[in-house]
Amino acid sequence: MKWEVVIGLEVHAQLSTQSKIFSGASTAFGAAPNTQACAVDIALPGVLPVMNRVAMEKAVRFGLAIGATVNPVSIFARKNYFYPDLPKGYQISQFEKPIVEGGQIAIRVGETERRINLTRAHLEEDAGKSLHEEFEGSTGIDLNRAGTPLLEIVSEPEMRSAAEAVAYARALHGLVTWLGICDGNMQEGSFRVDANVSVRPEGQAEFGTRREIKNLNSFRFLEQAINYEVQWQIDLIEDGGKVQQATVLFDPATGETRAMRSKEDAHDYRYFPDPDLLPLTVTEADFAAVRADMPELPGEMAARFVESFGVPELDAAQLTQSLDVARYFEAAAAASGQGKLAANWITGELAARLNREDMALAACPIAPERLAGLLVRIADNTVSSKLARQVFDALWDSELSADAVIERDGLKQVSDAGAIEKLVDDAIAGNPKAVEEFRAGKEKALNALAGQVMKASKGKANPAQVQDILRQKLAG
C-alpha cells in the first residue's frame, strides 16, 4: 500500500521585546534563575496583567507580511492545565478570536515552489522552565521565561514530506528574523517547532490519527524526527496496530520519538475569555504605524535583484533568505556593478568561508565594499578567478584593498598576447603526445596543454586567451 504523509507545524516564536507580554520584567536571556520574574509572572494573589503593546505591533507586522487578516479586535483566553512551571495554573493565550488569521508562506523544495496556508497566529505567554538535570532526585523551576511574549504560528496540514516541513520552517524562520520580530535563536529556545504528523492511504480524504512531536529546536532534528515518526506509524499500521493520538518527544541521541502523554484536544484545556484583560484592539493608527515601518519583504527584494542586477531567480531567492545577506549583496553589487559575480561569490566562496569559521555574516572581516574591489578586478581581467581566491584569503586576513593585495603579491593576470604566445609555444613543443591526441579529436588534451601554460605562468596567464591561442596554434 502507498501512504501519504500529512504534516502541520506549530511554531512558537519568542517576540523580541524588552519586557514580558503582561509585565515589566526583563526578557533578556541567560540571567540567574528566577531573577527576572516579578509578582505578575509568579502569579502572586491580587496582581493583574497589563498588555505589552510592542508585542501586539510585532504580531501585526507578521500578519501584514504574510497577507493575512489582522483582526482589529482579538480576545485573550485562559488555557487551563497544570504544570509545575506554570504558576497560575493556566496560560494566557488566544483561542476563538486570534490576532492573525490566514496568510501564506512560500516554500521551495528543489525546483518546485508552492505556498503553504496558515490557519492562524496568536499571542500568548511562555511558560517557565523545569530543570531536571541540575538537581539530583528533584526538579528545579526557573520562572525567568514565564510571561515572555510568544507568537504561535499554526500552519494548515498541507506539507507532505519532511523536506517540505523543513523548507517551511526555514522560510518562516527567515521571515520572522527579517521582520525583526524574533531573533530566531533556536539554541536559546526563541524559535521552537512542534510537528503534527499522520499518515493515510494514498487517495484517502480522511486524515489519519496524528501524533505531535514537541519542542524541536533545529531543522536537522525536525527532519529526522518526522522521518522516524512517519516510518514508525506506517510500520505500526501495516503490522495491524492503530496509531493513538499522543504527544511525543524526539531523542537526538537515538534518532527516535517516544510517547510523553496522550494528546489533549482543545476541550481538555477548558478555554474561556480572560476576565482580567480587555479585548486587544488594533486601531487604524496602529496599522498605519506598522505599515510605515515595514521593511521591503524578501519576495519583493528578490524580484528587484533579478530586475536590477540580472541575478537568476534561484540565486535571488537564496540571497534573500537573510536580511543581512541581502544587504551585503546589494552593497557589493552596487559598488562593483557586477550583480551575477557578486551573487556567485557571496553564495559560494564567502558562504563556505563563513561556514568553516562558524561565523555570522555580521562578524565577517571583509566589508561588501572590499569584496566589490575584488569583483571589479575579476571582471576587468586584472586577476584570474583562480588567483582571486588567494586575494580573497588575503582580504580575510588583512585590512588591505584588493588592488593592494594584487600589487603586493604579484597576482596581476598576464594578458599580453606575446607573452602568452611564448608560453603556448613552449607547452606545444614540450608535449607532442597531447598535441597529437588533440589533433586526433581528443578535446581533453587541450586542457592538459592549457594546464602546462598556467603552471608555467604560476596561474597568472589569462585562461581564455590561453585557450584561444592554443586552438589557433594547433589548427595550423
From Swiss-Prot:
The keyword ATP-binding applies. It catalyses: L-glutamyl-tRNA(Gln) + L-glutamine + ATP + H2O = L-glutaminyl-tRNA(Gln) + L-glutamate + ADP + phosphate + H(+); L-aspartyl-tRNA(Asn) + L-glutamine + ATP + H2O = L-asparaginyl-tRNA(Asn) + L-glutamate + ADP + phosphate + 2 H(+). Its EC number is 6.3.5.-. It is an enzyme of class 6 (ligase). GO terms for molecular function: asparaginyl-tRNA synthase (glutamine-hydrolyzing) activity; ATP binding; glutaminyl-tRNA synthase (glutamine-hydrolyzing) activity. GO terms for biological process: glutaminyl-tRNAGln biosynthesis via transamidation; translation. Keywords: ATP-binding, Ligase, Nucleotide-binding, Protein biosynthesis. InterPro entries: Asn/Gln-tRNA_amidoTrfase_suB/E (IPR017959), Asn/Gln-tRNA_Trfase_suB/E_cat (IPR006075), Asn/Gln_amidotransferase (IPR018027), Asn/Gln_tRNA_amidoTrase-B-like (IPR003789), GatB (IPR004413), GatB_C_1 (IPR042114), GatB_Yqey_C_2 (IPR023168), Gln-tRNA_amidoTrfase_suB_CS (IPR017958). Allows the formation of correctly charged Asn-tRNA(Asn) or Gln-tRNA(Gln) through the transamidation of misacylated Asp-tRNA(Asn) or Glu-tRNA(Gln) in organisms which lack either or both of asparaginyl-tRNA or glutaminyl-tRNA synthetases. The reaction takes place in the presence of glutamine and ATP through an activated phospho-Asp-tRNA(Asn) or phospho-Glu-tRNA(Gln). Belongs to the GatB/GatE family. GatB subfamily. Heterotrimer of A, B and C subunits. This is Aspartyl/glutamyl-tRNA(Asn/Gln) amidotransferase subunit B. It comes from Laribacter hongkongensis (strain HLHK9). The lineage of its organism: Bacteria, Pseudomonadati, Pseudomonadota, Betaproteobacteria, Neisseriales.
